[in-house]
């Protein structure tokens, strides 16, 4: 059987709304690709975004950015799916389930028809549900279908902790796991700053009410998307940087550990559901889970998060 030929420098973005367009803009500056294709139900929108972003190429590196169609996914290394109804003020990510599952039912089979053999990155919300939907509809191996998950939530947490402690957020190691949404869990038990446990670091920096402070930070992180949506109607810059980072890890085969959404089997007594847990990510997608230390309470909350997602999946007909 002839081996499928993949263009390792080609990416396809499906969905050219705020998130898709901002992500392409970030990817254009990354140097990862020489070809980026934009696909949208509104062809004019895709063409306009491609034209606008292309005008920045002289300040980046040579590449082609253009509007295309589903035939362009055939040889792509990675397909990013941001298409879907956006979250409106007052809505939760899970409120988007039925609308966006219907959209995925029209998108994923079109990708499957082209015998796509690269990595599929799901960004649309609710990302955990849609990642599992994409796995079922695409026929791709589970390790090659990844959701952006809590990569952005974890970045928000690290940013807030860095700000609180007056340290570089890149030195903060902390994960949010579970659902990318209201049942997300902060893994405080494993949080540290360059190897120093978070509680110790808080006291070293003069913060002695660290339980109250961290609870306040966790709430701020969980509610940040709602706050941004209320103020400017959509979030897109943070997730665009998250998409860029995930693509870097995949395209460079970095084997970095990221809290992406993927199918979980047997970790913390969770099985058969897609949610975010730290995993080693490389050129072939998910390599293995990293079962970080959790307290009993954190493990229980994670199981509750998984159970809530499972119940929603059981209501979806595919």
Describe the residue ranges of each PLM region:
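N-terminal Rossmann-fold NAD(P) dinucleotide-binding loop
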Residues: 20-21
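A short, basic/flexible loop-to-alpha-helix module at the beginning of a structural domain
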Residues: 1-9
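Rossmann-like NAD(P)-binding element
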Residues: 58-119
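Conserved S-adenosyl-L-methionine
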Residues: 29-35, 139-142
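Conserved N-terminal Rossmann-fold NAD(P) cofactor-binding segment
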Residues: 35, 39-77, 91, 310-318
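Glycine-rich Rossmann-fold phosphate-binding loop(s) that bind the pyrophosphate
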Residues: 16-17
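C-terminal substrate-binding/catalytic lobe of Rossmann-fold NAD(P)-dependent dehydrogenases
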Residues: 138-144, 154-318
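Rossmann-like NAD(P)(H) cofactor-binding subdomain of soluble oxidoreductases
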Residues: 92-158
């Amino acid at each position: 059987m002839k081996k499928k030929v993949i263009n390792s420098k080609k990416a396809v973005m499906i969905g050219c709304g705020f998130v898709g367009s901002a992500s392409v803009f970030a990817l254009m500056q990354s140097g990862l690709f020489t070809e980026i294709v934009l696909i949208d139900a509104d062809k004019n929108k895709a063409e306009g975004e491609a034209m606008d972003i292309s005008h920045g190429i002289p300040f980046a590196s040579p590449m082609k950015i253009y509007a295309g169609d589903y035939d362009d996914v055939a040889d792509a290394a990675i397909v990013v799916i941001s298409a879907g109804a956006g979250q409106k003020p007052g809505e939760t990510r899970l409120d988007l389930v039925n609308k966006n599952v219907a959209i995925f039912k029209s998108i994923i089979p079109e990708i499957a028809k082209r015998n796509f053999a690269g990595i599929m990155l799901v960004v649309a919300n609710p990302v955990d549900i849609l990642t599992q939907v994409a796995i079922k509809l695409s026929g791709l191996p589970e390790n090659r279908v990844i959701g952006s998950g809590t990569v952005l939530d974890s970045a928000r947490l690290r940013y807030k902790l860095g700000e609180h402690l007056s340290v570089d957020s890149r030195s903060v190691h902390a994960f949010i796991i579970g659902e990318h949404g209201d049942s997300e869990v902060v893994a405080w038990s494993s949080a540290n700053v360059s190897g120093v446990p978070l509680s110790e670091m808080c006291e070293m920096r003069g913060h002695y009410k660290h339980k109250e402070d961290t609870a306040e930070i966790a709430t701020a992180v969980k509610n940040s998307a709602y706050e941004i949506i209320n103020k400017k109607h959509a979030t897109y810059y943070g997730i665009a940087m998250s998409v860029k980072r995930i693509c870097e890890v995949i395209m460079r085969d970095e084997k970095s550990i990221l809290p992406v959404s993927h199918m979980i089997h047997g970790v913390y007594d969770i099985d058969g559901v897609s949610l975010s847990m730290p995993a080693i990510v490389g050129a072939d997608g998910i390599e293995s889970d990293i079962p970080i230390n959790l307290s009993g309470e954190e493990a229980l909350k994670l199981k509750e998060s998984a159970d809530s997602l499972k119940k929603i999946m059981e209501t979806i007909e595919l």
